[in-house]
């Protein structure tokens, strides 16, 4: 951790506890600050609040009294606290310094940063970069919106390691000095307008990621959204990714991922499915190359990376059949997305809690479905759907039985996909439990194990 003295003996008000507020408060104590934590909820039984009180932190809960601003503290804002909260608005009116927890992580670390933001794909891209580092001899530590508090991870990261930080628009809003060496914008679409009010405000929040970059830094973005990048404010070297054409950066040509004219890998050898994931993969490969990850480690990652748990997660191959766990698909929209991700014939495992809906909206996405293995309360509805489309329908009692029956109908090169399009509660407590049962059954029933 950098020996940062800018907060020593300063009054600091942390607004919002949760995980990031808790870690920020502990860090601020280490940095010699006089710390108060304020949260609108009752924290009288909160173990984190009790821990902080034992360290000398003052806790003010149950509201946001404006009197907390009377001693003109520096504000550290939890990303979950909107800027519209009265105490933050008043702090702006009084021209008080407001830091975000991510900004704090930057101030106390000399580690180079790969920062990833975007409306979609940022978690997959961040995780894939982390896996590429793991496959090499380099160290990259995941942090930020992906679930590891940035200010905590930053303390553990040395200058010769990378911080790989996923950033939401909420975290980027408060950027002042934050400067990643490599910044990625996966894409920008309309989202979180309840928070940002306008699309322009949301886009501007995302653009904060390159606000402080210099000509020694890199910005990686989607070539087909390059019009969203403001060139007049951009100093970093801009590189692009595209699945459709050659660009200055990384692209797909003749079925290969290509960087600077060099073929890296055939896309048929990737285990992460879907056109959307091709863009995530390109961004991750380019960032990892720029950070010095060897091509061999990148290829190793691309041929083994299973994705995010229960979200089109690759769980293994038996003979020529790849198996994917998409248990998080608890509605038809998510399953449409999954069915559209494969060009190969699909053995589709589906069914679950009956909420009274039919599934006809899935019909346009079923062209590659060869077999349906149906279970749960919606078994008969899915059987009727499959029969109406001329699919082979097999009935199973549960996930375990479904995996067993797959063995009787699967053909070479079929993809086996669990994407239930239903909640799990008829048979399993959570979609995670359902997905784990699928993985366990795959391992238990298949001869390769």
From Swiss-Prot:
The lineage of its organism: Bacteria, Bacillati, Bacillota, Bacilli, Bacillales. Pathway: Cell wall biogenesis; peptidoglycan biosynthesis. Coiled coil: none annotated. InterPro entries: Mur-like_cat_sf, Mur_ligase_C, Mur_ligase_C_dom_sf, Mur_ligase_cen, MurD. It catalyses: UDP-N-acetyl-alpha-D-muramoyl-L-alanine + D-glutamate + ATP = UDP-N-acetyl-alpha-D-muramoyl-L-alanyl-D-glutamate + ADP + phosphate + H(+). Cell wall formation. Catalyzes the addition of glutamate to the nucleotide precursor UDP-N-acetylmuramoyl-L-alanine (UMA). Its EC number is 6.3.2.9. GO terms for cellular component: cytoplasm. It comes from Staphylococcus haemolyticus (strain JCSC1435). ATP binds at residues 118-124. GO terms for biological process: cell division; cell wall organization; peptidoglycan biosynthetic process; regulation of cell shape. Belongs to the MurCDEF family. Keywords: ATP-binding, Cell cycle, Cell division, Cell shape, Cell wall biogenesis/degradation, Cytoplasm, Ligase, Nucleotide-binding, Peptidoglycan synthesis. Pfam families: Mur_ligase_C (PF02875), Mur_ligase_M (PF08245), MurD-like_N (PF21799). It is found in: Cytoplasm. This is UDP-N-acetylmuramoylalanine--D-glutamate ligase. The keyword DNA-binding does not apply. It comes from the Bacteria. Its main location: cytoplasm. One of its GO terms (molecular function) is UDP-N-acetylmuramoylalanine-D-glutamate ligase activity.
């Amino acid at each position: 951790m950098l020996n940062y003295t800018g907060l020593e003996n300063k009054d600091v008000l942390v607004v919002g506890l949760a995980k990031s507020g808790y870690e920020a408060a502990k860090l601020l104590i280490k940095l010699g600050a006089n710390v108060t934590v304020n949260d609108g909820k009752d924290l009288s039984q909160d173990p984190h609040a009790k821990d902080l009180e034992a360290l000398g932190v003052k806790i003010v809960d149950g509201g946001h009294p404006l009197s907390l601003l009377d001693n003109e503290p520096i504000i550290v804002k939890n990303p979950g606290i909107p800027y519209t909260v009265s105490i933050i608005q008043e702090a702006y009116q009084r021209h008080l310094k407001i830091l975000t927890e991510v900004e704090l992580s930057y101030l106390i670390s000399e580690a180079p940063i790969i920062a990833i933001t975007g409306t979609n794909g940022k978690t997959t891209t961040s995780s894939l970069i982390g896996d590429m580092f793991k496959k090499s001899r380099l160290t990259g530590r995941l942090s930020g919106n992906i679930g590891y508090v940035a200010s905590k991870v930053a303390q553990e990261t040395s200058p010769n390691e990378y911080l790989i930080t996923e950033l939401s628009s909420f975290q980027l809003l408060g950027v002042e000095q934050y400067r990643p060496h490599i910044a990625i914008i996966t894409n920008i679409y309309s989202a979180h307008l309840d928070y940002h009010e306008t699309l322009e405000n949301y886009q501007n929040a995302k653009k904060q990621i390159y606000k402080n970059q210099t000509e020694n830094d890199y910005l990686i973005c989607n070539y087909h959204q390059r019009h969203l990048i403001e060139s007049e404010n951009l100093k970093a070297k801009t590189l692009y990714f595209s699945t459709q054409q050659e660009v200055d950066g990384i692209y797909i040509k003749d079925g290969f991922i290509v960087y600077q004219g060099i073929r890296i890998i055939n896309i048929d050898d990737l285990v992460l499915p879907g056109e959307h994931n091709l863009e995530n993969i390109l961004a991750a490969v380019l960032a990892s190359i720029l950070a010095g990850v060897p091509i061999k480690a990148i290829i190793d990652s691309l041929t083994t990376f299973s994705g995010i748990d229960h979200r089109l997660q690759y769980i293994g191959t038996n003979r020529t059949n790849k198996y994917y766990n998409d248990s998080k698909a608890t509605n038809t929209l998510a399953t449409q997305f999954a069915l559209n991700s494969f060009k190969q014939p699909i053995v589709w495992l589906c069914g679950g809690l009956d909420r009274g809906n039919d599934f006809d909206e899935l019909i346009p996405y079923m062209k590659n479905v060869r077999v349906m293995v149906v279970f749960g309360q919606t078994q008969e509805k899915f059987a009727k759907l499959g029969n109406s489309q001329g699919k082979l329908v097999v009935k199973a009692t549960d996930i375990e039985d479904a995996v067993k029956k797959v063995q009787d109908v699967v053909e070479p090169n079929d993809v086996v996909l669990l994407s239930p399009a239903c909640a799990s509660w008829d048979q399993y407590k959570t979609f995670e439990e359902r997905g784990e049962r699928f993985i366990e059954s795959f391992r238990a029933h298949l001869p390769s194990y």
